[in-house]
Amino acid sequence: MPAGVNFTSPQRTATDVQFLADRTFTVDGERQTQQQIFDTVFEMIANARHIVLVDMFLFNDYLGKGSEQHIPLSDELSNALIAQKKRYPDLQIHVISDPINSLYGGLPSKHFVELKAAGIPVTQTDLTQLRDSNPAYSGFWRLLIQPFGNSEGGWLPNPFGEGQVSVRSYLNLLNFKANHRKLLIADNGSELTALVTSANPHDGSSAHGNVALRFNGPAAWDLLESEKAMLALSGKALAEVALPQKAENTDSNLSVQVVTENAVEQASLAMINQAKSGDKLDMAMFYLSDRDIVEALKSAQTRGVVLRVLLDPNKDAFGRQKNGIPNRPVAHELTQAGIIVRWCDTHGEQCHAKWLMHRGAGETTMLLGSTNFTRRNLHNLNLETSVIVKGPANAAPFRRGRSWFDERWHNLYGRHYSVDYENYADERRWPQLLYRSMEATGLSTF
């Protein structure tokens, strides 16, 4: 593994911890959207004077085959960064993203071109430094394709939008590896603040349901350290940030901890395995397939933990229909074990959150971020970042997190979010076998 990956920070006290959510729901059959996450991102950028670091997986305006209404998040983020750089020319801004946005060198990203022209460096992560998540294919690719690089243009259609790309863009895509992180670090003039999320500045994803955590203090500096490692992985570096590090506020009863890659799995398993009879464990997840997590949930049910699992039905992907794998076979397995599962009732958008909350007798723990609960996301293959918050149950981020989950689970306030398990159940044998095979071998997109 590259240096700095699989990172676990200390637990840091924090005073300004905010839970944020983007909601999509229907009222009388009409889809509506409420968004908080990128409003907060733009506010953080506007307040920055010393440093802005953006690390986002999807940063483009591609819609795929989707025709639903969307928000031009990619333009809005690019414009916000360029405008702030013009206001404060000495402001240090870095953008880190995944090379999927340029089709692995096959099609220039207009946003990256504009950012570079404004004096903002853009680092597309060197994915060749990462372990292969699809080893049956990647050996062939490394030997026969990688040495020849890629070139712009070609005769094949762009799989995500307009333009044409080479066959090598498609062959690169089949490695199924990514910098999947989604975060922002910025100062507010006096201290460092950070935001970790499941949301992308991607127009085709702008209606997705997502969550985020905004926080300040030493945990934000820990996140910055983990991002320095991401720059180093691609041969880049961050200049010194001219901002004093404030001491931890020992009066706070909340702690924030940064975890990346496999450290997310270890933290998640600890949350589930430590839950006792009568404790409450709630999960909202876009992809759930990791066998260790699934078995831990079943064991928690046996111990008497009260579980609620809200899953995306895996039927929509930017205008394309999906086959329900992995979530529908996994949901069948969970319901067979007695766990209550509900589905997000999506209409083109995705239920994209990656969120887990444990409520025990003395302390509440919440985990959220970029990390789906799959082998590829949890086993040091993709690059991922999540955060863990711990503290008393009545603390504001936990109240808001519970309210967000309950609203979706119970369809509160006249808003329709979710349906019973039976609505999207698939109990056929072949999807279960296919899911197990795809999860084990890496021959999958999840």
Label each PLM-derived region with a short phrase.
Residues M1-F446:
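Charged, low-complexity intrinsically disordered terminal segments
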